[in-house]
Curated annotation (Swiss-Prot):
Keywords: FAD, Flavoprotein, Monooxygenase, Oxidoreductase. It comes from Armillaria mellea (Honey mushroom). It is an enzyme of class 1 (oxidoreductase). Chloride binds at S328, G329. Belongs to the flavin-dependent halogenase family. The keyword Oxidoreductase applies. This is Flavin-dependent halogenase armH5.
Length: 523
C-alpha cells in the first residue's frame, strides 16, 4: 500500500511513476536503498503506446514481475507486420528469430503501468500519488540553476489536497515524462528533431479482425504507410476486446489536412484512416469505432545533450523520445532505468567515480535511442515518406559512432578512416537498415537456414555484401534477401534483453546484473 506521509528525507527520490520511474525505483529498493517516488496523478491512468518489444518480458523477469503480466492475459504478440510499400506484400518481423522466449505482449497501458507501480510498492518503494514536484533546490547555486558545481538536494511538492512540503535526498532520478523537469526547467538542454515533429490521433474500436487470426502471426500489430505517403497508421489488438488504431503524421501535415478537410478531431481521424487500406480491411464490415474515444497527442521526437549530472539521472520520456513507430518507448524507459540504478549504485559503492557513472549513463541512453532512431528513419525512407528527411542535426555524432561502430565497414567501407559523421555516412547507414523491411517469408528463412547454417544466427558477425557474394550462389536471391535482413536486425540485437548490459561494454564497464550486487564492473 502507498505510504501516508511524504518523509522529509530519502536516499533516492524518483519523480514519476511510469515504467521508467517504477522500474528504477524497484531495482534500487531490491538493493536495500531507501527510495521515495512522487507521482503527479492517480493510477491507473490512461496512456497510449500499447505495443511492447521482446525485451519487456526479460526486464520484468529480472524484478520477478513477468508472471503477473502473464496472469493478466495481455494479448500475446508474436511479432509485427509492416506495410510500407503499397503494391508489395507486407514485411513481418517474427520475434522467434531473436531466440527462444522472445515473444511479448500488446498491453492495456493503464493496467500494465499500474502493475509495475504497485510492484514497486511491494518491493519497499514509498509511493505518493497525486503529488506533484513543483521545484528542485540545488546546492552551491545563487539563482537555483544547474551549474557544474551544483547538484539537486531537495524537491518541493504539492499534493491534490493542497498540502505542500519539501523532501531532501542524496540522489535524484527524473522520470517525469515529457514534462522532463530537469531537462526543460533547469538544464534547458532538450533538442527537438524537426524531421520527426509528429502528432498522433488515435481511438479504440470493437470487433476488428485479427491479423492472420488463428495462425502463428495471430494478434501481431499492423503498421501501414498511408496511401498519400504523408503519414502512417497502427492497429494493435488488446486483450479487453478492443483494438487501438491510430494515425501519425508531421505536425505541419496535420495542420494542413485539418484546415482542408472535415472539421473536428474525430472526423479528421476517420478521414485519414481511409488512406490505410490494410487497416480498413481488418476493420471490415463488423468493426465499429467506439464513439468519443478519439484523442490526440504530440509525438515530437527529442533528445538532450546530457542525461545526467552530479547525483542525478534522467530517464524515460524525460530524457528522450524517438518516435511511436517500432514501440520503443517502454524499452528505452526500462533501459534507462537499469542504467540509472546501476550507475547510482556503482557510484555509491565506489566502483566508478561519479563523473564516470554519469558518462556511462549518458552513453547508454544515447546509444539505445540512436539505434532506434536509425531504424525509424530507415522506415520513413522505405515508405518514401513525403516531407521526412534525415537531418545530421537530428543525430548525436558520438552516440552514432558508439551505436554503429560494428557496422562501419559495411556502410562506410573498410578503408574509410573518416571519424566525423557526415550526411553521406548517415544516409548509407539508413540504407543499410532499410533491409529490415525486405519482405521475406518464414519458409524462405527456414530454407536458407538449412543451406547456410550459422551464417543466419543473429549473434553472428555482420557480413558485407562482398562476403555474402562469396558464400552464396549469384542467383540465390532468397538467401541474399534473408541474410541482408538478418544483417540489419543485428543493429538491435543488444536491445532484446537486459542481459546485454553484462556483455556490451560502455567506456570499459559492464553491469553486474545480479540482485544484491547490482552495479558497474570492469569489462
Amino acid at each position: 500500500m502507498p505510504s501516508e506521509y511524504v518523509p522529509e528525507a530519502t536516499t533516492v527520490l524518483v519523480i514519476g511513476g511510469g515504467p521508467a520511474g517504477s522500474y528504477a525505483s524497484t531495482l534500487l529498493a531490491r538493493e536495500g536503498i531507501d527510495v521515495v517516488l512522487l507521482e503527479a496523478v492517480k493510477h491507473p491512468r490512461e496512456h497510449v503506446g500499447e505495443s511492447m518489444l521482446p525485451s519487456m518480458r526479460h526486464y520484468l523477469r529480472f524484478i520477478d514481475l513477468e508472471s503477473e503480466y502473464d496472469a493478466r492475459k495481455f494479448m500475446h504478440k508474436p511479432g509485427a507486420a509492416f506495410k510500407f510499400v503499397h503494391g508489395q506484400r507486407e514485411c513481418y518481423t517474427d520475434f522467434k528469430i531473436l531466440g527462444p522466449d522472445r515473444t511479448t505482449w500488446n498491453v492495456f497501458r493503464a493496467e500494465a503501468d499500474e502493475l509495475m507501480l504497485r510492484h514497486a510498492a511491494s518491493q519497499g518503494v514509498k509511493i505518493f500519488e497525486e503529488t506533484r514536484v513543483e521545484s528542485i533546490t540545488f546546492s552551491e547555486s545563487v539563482d537555483n540553476s544547474v551549474s557544474p558545481e551544483s547538484r539537486p538536494i531537495a524537491a518541493s511538492w504539492k499534493n491534490k489536497s493542497g498540502q505542500v512540503g519539501k523532501i531532501s535526498f542524496n540522489w535524484l532520478i527524473d522520470a517525469s515524462g515529457r514534462q522532463g523537469i530537469m531537462s526543460t526547467k533547469y538544464m534547458k538542454n532538450r533538442i527537438y528533431r524537426e524531421g520527426l515533429r509528429n502528432v498522433a490521433a488515435y481511438g479504440y474500436w470493437k470487433d476488428v479482425t485479427v491479423f492472420e487470426e488463428g495462425g502463428p502471426r495471430s494478434n501481431a500489430p499492423w503498421f501501414e504507410c498511408l496511401t498519400d505517403r504523408e503519414g502512417w497508421a497502427w492497429l494493435i489488438p488488446l486483450h479487453n476486446g478492443t483494438t487501438s488504431i491510430g494515425v501519425v503524421m508531421h505536425q505541419d501535415t496535420s495542420n494542413r489536412k485539418k484546415a482542408e478537410g472535415p472539421s473536428g478531431l474525430e472526423q479528421h481521424y476517420l478521414s485519414q484512416l481511409k488512406l490505410a487500406p490494410g487497416v480498413q480491411d481488418l476493420i471490415g464490415s463488423k468493426g465499429s469505432y467506439v464513439p468519443g474515444s478519439v484523442k490526440s497527442t504530440a509525438d515530437y521526437s527529442y533528445h538532450a545533450t546530457e542525461y545526467s549530472g552530479d547525483h542525478y539521472r534522467i530517464i524515460g520520456d524525460a530524457a528522450a523520445f524517438v518516435d511511436p513507430l517500432f514501440s520503443s518507448g517502454v524499452h528505452v524507459a526500462m533501459t534507462g532505468a537499469l542504467s540509472a540504478a546501476s550507475t547510482i549504485l556503482g557510484s555509491m559503492k565506489g566502483q566508478v567515480t561519479e563523473v564516470e557513472a554519469q558518462a556511462w549513463h549518458d552513453a547508454k541512453i544515447g546509444i539505445c535511442q540512436t539505434r532506434f532512431l536509425l531504424v525509424v528513419l530507415s522506415a520513413y525512407r522505405q515508405m518514401q515518406h513525403v516531407g521526412n528527411k534525415a537531418l545530421l542535426d537530428d543525430v548525436n555524432a558520438s552516440n552514432f559512432d558508439a551505436a554503429f561502430s560494428l557496422f562501419r565497414p559495411i556502410y562506410q567501407g573498410e578503408h574509410d578512416t573518416s571519424t566525423s559523421l557526415t550526411n553521406e555516412e548517415l544516409s548509407k547507414m539508413i540504407e543499410f537498415t532499410r533491409n529490415l523491411f525486405t519482405p521475406t517469408t518464414h519458409q524462405q528463412y527456414n530454407e536458407v537456414k538449412q543451406r547456410v547454417g550459422d551464417l543466419i544466427a543473429l549473434s553472428g558477425p555482420v557480413m558485407p555484401s562482398d562476403e555474402l557474394d562469396k558464400v552464396l550462389d549469384s542467383d540465390d536471391s532468397d538467401a541474399k534477401a534473408v541474410l541482408k535482413r538478418i544483417n540489419s536486425l543485428k543493429v538491435l540485437r543488444n536491445d532484446t534483453s537486459p542481459e546485454s548490459f553484462t556483455s556490451e561494454a560502455v567506456n570499459g564497464y559492464v553491469v553486474n546484473l545480479e540482485r544484491g550486487q547490482l552495479g558497474l564492473v570492469r569489462a
